[in-house]
UniProtKB/Swiss-Prot annotation, chain A:
Residues holding [4Fe-4S] cluster: 1062, 1065, 1075, 1080
Cofactor(s) named in the record: [4Fe-4S] cluster
Binding site for Zn(2+): 1015, 1018, 1030, 1033
Designated name of the protein: DNA polymerase delta catalytic subunit
CDD domains associated with the record: DNA_polB_delta_exo, POLBc_delta
EC numbers: 2.7.7.7
Domain-related comment: The CysB motif binds 1 4Fe-4S cluster and is required for the formation of polymerase complexes.
Subunit structure comment from the entry: Heterodimer with subunits of 125 kDa and 50 kDa. The 125 kDa subunit contains the polymerase active site and most likely the active site for the 3'-5' exonuclease activity.
Organism encoding this protein: Oryza sativa subsp. japonica (Rice)
From Swiss-Prot, chain B:
GO cellular component: delta DNA polymerase complex
Catalyzed reactions per annotation: DNA(n) + a 2'-deoxyribonucleoside 5'-triphosphate = DNA(n+1) + diphosphate
Taxonomic lineage from the root: Eukaryota, Viridiplantae, Streptophyta, Embryophyta, Tracheophyta
First-tier enzyme category under EC: transferase
A molecular function (GO) term: DNA-directed DNA polymerase activity
Keyword Nucleus found: yes
Pfam families: DNA_pol_D_N (PF18018), DNA_pol_E_B (PF04042)
Name of the protein: DNA polymerase delta small subunit
Single Gene Ontology BP annotation: DNA strand elongation involved in DNA replication
Cellular compartment(s): Nucleus
EC numbers: 2.7.7.7
Family to which this protein belongs: Belongs to the DNA polymerase delta/II small subunit family.
Domain of life where this protein originates: Eukaryota
Complexes and interactors: Heterodimer with subunits of 125 kDa and 50 kDa.
Amino acid sequence: MSSGGRGGKRRGAPPPGPSGAAAKRAHPGGTPQPPPPAATAAAPVAEEEDMMDEDVFLDETILAEDEEALLLLDRDEALASRLSRWRRPALPADLASGCSRNVAFQQLEIDYVIGESHKVLLPNSSGPAAILRIFGVTREGHSVCCQVHGFEPYFYISCPMGMGPDDISRFHQTLEGRMKDSNRNSNVPRFVKRIELVQKQTIMHYQPQQSQPFLKIVVALPTMVASCRGILERGITIEGLGSKSFLTYESNILFALRFMIDCNIVGGNWIEVPAGKYMKAARIMSYCQLELDCLYSDLVSHAAEGEHSKMAPFRILSFDIECAGRKGHFPEPTHDPVIQIANLVTLQGEGQPFVRNVMTLKSCSPIVGVDVMSFDTERDVLLAWRDFIREVDPDIIIGYNICKFDLPYLIERAEVLKIVEFPILGRIRNSRVRVRDTTFSSRQYGMRESKDVAVEGRVQFDLLQAMQRDYKLSSYSLNSVSAHFLGEQKEDVHHSIISDLQNGNSETRRRLAVYCLKDAYLPQRLLDKLMYIYNYVEMARVTGVPISFLLSRGQSIKVLSQLLRKAKQKNLVIPNIKGQASGQDTFEGATVLEARAGFYEKPIATLDFASLYPSIMMAYNLCYCTLVPPEDARKLNLPPESVNKTPSGETFVKPDVQKGILPEILEELLAARKRAKADLKEAKDPFERAVLDGRQLALKISANSVYGFTGATVGQLPCLEISSSVTSYGRQMIEHTKKLVEDKFTTLGGYEHNAEVIYGDTDSVMVQFGVSTVEDAMKLGREAADYISGTFIKPIKLEFEKIYFPYLLISKKRYAGLYWTNPEKFDKMDTKGIETVRRDNCLLVKNLVTECLHKILVDRDVPGAVQYVKNTISDLLMNRVDLSLLVITKGLTKTGEDYAVKAAHVELAERMRKRDAATAPTVGDRVPYVIIKAAKGAKAYERSEDPIYVLDNNIPIDPQYYLENQISKPLLRIFEPILKNASRELLHGSHTRAVSISTPSNSGIMKFAKKQLTCLGCKAVISGSNQTLCFHCKGREAELYCKTVGNVSELEMLFGRLWTQCQECQGSLHQDVLCTSRDCPIFYRRRKAQKDMAEARVQLQRWDF
Amino acid sequence: MERKQAEYSNLDERYAIQGEKYQGQQYSHIYFTRLHHMRNLLHALVPSWKPHLPVTTVLGLEEGKDCIIVGTLYKHMKLKPSILDEYSKERSAIPLVKPHNFMHPDDHLILEDESGRVTLAGAIPPAAYVTGVVIALHGKETSAGNFLVEDILEAGIPPQITLPSINEDKYVVFVSGLSIGSEKFNPLQFQLLIDHITGHLGDENEQSIASNIVRVVVAGNSVHISPRFFNGQAVASKDQSRIAEPIKELDIMLTQLVASLPVDMMPGSNDPANFSLPQQPLHRCLFAGAATYNTFSSCSNPHQFELDSVRFIGTSGQNIDDLYKYSDAKDKLEFVERTLRWRHLAPTAPNSLGCYPYTDKDPFLVESCPHVYFVGNQDKYETQLLQGLEKQKVRLICIPRFCDSGVAVMLNLRNLECSTLSFSTSFDA
């Protein structure tokens, strides 16, 4: 994210939209800003998180009140009363009128605006000031907007030696002058409000003295932190001290986060404003039911415990839109109308949505249990949706791909239609929502382009983004995601059909509406199923960042937030060190012991280090503030007994000298996790359990991400001394464990066998003790874990967790085995690194690998597995494999010209467009293809073909391609440790000699061929049109008929099962199945069954003479 | 002695799919036709059932208002096997369900018409109904959007042509589940049956009874062909001829029968016929010997015919077996009775029972009540004379599998009374 570069660009451009007052989200006062600090402008994407303040909303974007009144004129009365049914419960009388009771609410969003400072609450200030806004919901379900006054932006610099109070005021004046120069057009009376001398200590490196003087610089507006920092970093001349450039501290923290840290507020916690400490807003700015003004010092922030760990009844809106695209194009807002919007609103904690409605363009037949609202113009549809949002007032907006598609589409469409009053979707009156392009880049999640639609006061939660973050799946289509998590196939209507349905009658539009509703419901169900609300709120509470950060930002902000909180307690300040993006400072990673590949038929015990990296950091007190750099080591002359030298050569002081902050954070996280897990065992209430489980998960993830934070070279506070020490300790421990195990568990030591370490990964070691029962191996495993743990510094602990038996070790990071935690029965089959779910594999590979592993590990039947492979290969060569198993799918992300290398799916899309532009895949679609037989020497990308086309025209597939490029590698990987000559045995045996290739029905040569009937028994050509068998086969008539009819019978069974399944997914018996979901495993089978059926019946009819 | 004759007319025409083709049609049409036909019937019955209530569609429901809706039932079943299970991620070692019944306490019914669906609650037991039945319901919509059922109207037993009066004993013999080619088949047992029917066995009295047998109906599963011949793998040439062995054996035995009296041959689920209902007649080329007699007739399943104006209808059992998988009743006869009351031989087709995708008709609708309704391949012999509200009388028969029980069923056309012919080849029985 880089707002610096972006902000600069936008400022010059006229605001889009017809009205000059279109929402413009920029810097305060709309004044031209100085160029953003060089650091951010020069490297727009390099930083994972740019700490520039962005959550600023302008007064200017707010429309004049008379304008507002105009907008609300001539709204449909009937619609208004329809929508008003879904309003929030009315405020109780005392809250509605007075200020006589405490207001407690769970906050979800915190941002700020620049406004005049509050005259009553802050009688001594004037001019523009930052006003924080906290949006939340009370226990009774009332929405609250709390405006917090008096919190000022600040940062630190270290005080130059010998600076006295007079020097400070001179320094103040100089700085003020420089600020004025670079912010000429600003109407702020004073830029630097004050400079205070404080006693603090830097977090960087061990410092023997407790504190030293720092200057706390308080500025007028949050954005001035950056410009002031720029001035100080570049250097400033101070009278008497000369020119000096400063290192700034805590100068890159988002203002809202700064506020949360200072007020002890964590994401998603409960906040209480005591009676008498707040006042009702004089001028209502938001659509919230309750709008308060108060001072930041009067807020009471509750820790998430007991009553305050519960969730408020948030309103969650799940929605989906349908657009009528033109044939052959993906819908574009400039051309294609929005025709339907389906909405479901659910109260947090309830199983069923309480609002179900769909807004349609043109009439639509009613749907049971759904409010259908039809409109004649698109304008009315869009405005009705806006009104709906305003009435229902959702706290959280969810959907599938809403951030990149639905929301931007609606807004851009409204712009095209010149509906200026549409995008008022946030909670602030008359503040328009605008679309911006953003890129998000992070080491963990990769670079991602996205659109950012800020809806003030409402949290957006795009399930697609969440899925992409949290799960590795082969496909992220809503269909395959719901198949994966909900076990359901989703009906998929191709976008070329959508327009036809829309242009039909009210019945066909109803059909579309039902589909649209289903798409709106699935995200809600995913949200429930995966406990996303609980997990994300808990993550926000544990790490202390707002919920919206969790989806839009990377890992490091979470660690930074914890670090800042802890540092504040310890009176430490964090320097603003920009990471060097250079990759020179790499360090040696984790160790992996040599894997002794093989198939182990004796139990393998696995010894795991529990939370290895966090434990190392705790055990050896590794932290920023305990690190002693080599130059200091000489100076300080620390006695050797009070420091640890790490294997990578760094020096850290021991905890009795100075306790590290990171170890302390980790201790707290792990202790909290232990507590959460214990509470989880006790808890009965399912909601409470959900919260606790979410919490323990969040704690675990947070603990593990601390190490990564120190190693992120482009992060906020990289410290490679720490991360390389951690990994070096890790390596040492793995080696140490191996040595101890192999020394102790020997026949000489009185054990039955010599133990052997066959493999070791980052934090685990696999040992073969040589015993043959799971029970014995468990006993020895436990003994070894206890013995070795005793040799480590606490809290590093080696645990015995599981046995693999049998165990197939292929190479490092690739293995499979049966997983045992009790001696009676294995728990599951565990595999790692064996591609069963890779995207560019066809289903055949997945099935084959899974089945083989099952046969080898569970059935212990290696010959059976070999036979299975042979049969499958033979089926493949004999053209007996179901085509859907051979389909390979790839996403088309850009058009053909943009791809540097020719790719199979791109070429195919191009060819399909020439055949029929209407149904050809467009950018954004997934392209399924199979590899067909073609002329010798044809490139693989030329041999891709549409599976449907292949089915319809009997085109032969290329079994050799599948054999060599798809199945051989994964198979050999599995079988090589087991079989000698695996390749010869499996891939070149006698079973590969019989080959059958179908004859294409559309190839050139067939045009010259004459069709003749052949005997069904022996394929001899027979003369006479009404015969089935040749003379010789006549005697086998009964037998051959049985085979023909048996074939028909099988196909009929398949046909029935496939088509009734589709009816079931579709949820209707009386309507034709429309679904064309190519992600569905039975789509091609269904099509093939239909075709085969027709052919088989023709064959059968030949007997009827 | 001379064998008695009865006038026979075959009514299987409606089950023929000779001219039909698979042209991409789907199953929605058959439901549509069924609903259309049954709704007309039910609407006609409503005035005499609850004349004061309005009849509406699922869409027209208003919360809290009493009304009648007519539609097709859909039963949502948790345990219903799905073809998608083949693709599920985890394979479980033990099958979770007993294979014979997919019922679960969470099952619920949904009523569907062209306008929409509504979930049913109240006085309608999910266990007694299956997907595909068309009924009328009295009830009202609840605030949760469900339909609270108060009363159910089924179409009931259809009208019947009057039973002709026949003054003499004439018997029809039903046999099913011979399973020639399976281990259970006992050739001697079947030979005894043949000899008994053809009059080669027993004393004069028995022979005179045998001479009153006017027809034999073989209700499915006459042969058993090992499934390994059809799993797509190549069959060794020496095995190829073995496929047809059971059929040849059947042909030889059938030939003895057809030489002395007419035989109706119905296909069943294990026979070399198509899978979907209606199953088409077994091909004559399978019966090189028997087919040369004009007394041999190969029929469809379901099979419908008249003997001396007594109306018969019957199946080889798939329709009832499927009801048994997806619903619950005290005995098999109750399932049989239900199909009559629902006026549909196979309501679960096409949902869980294979069926041809008709576009313009639903051949399984029962428009006129038969006098005899038989179902082949059941576990045990059961029978009942069902009386309808309009004095309809139907003889319901469950024919046991002959290979298990050695029992054939004999029906007297004169009084629709039923008895069994039991054959055993062991002495202690």
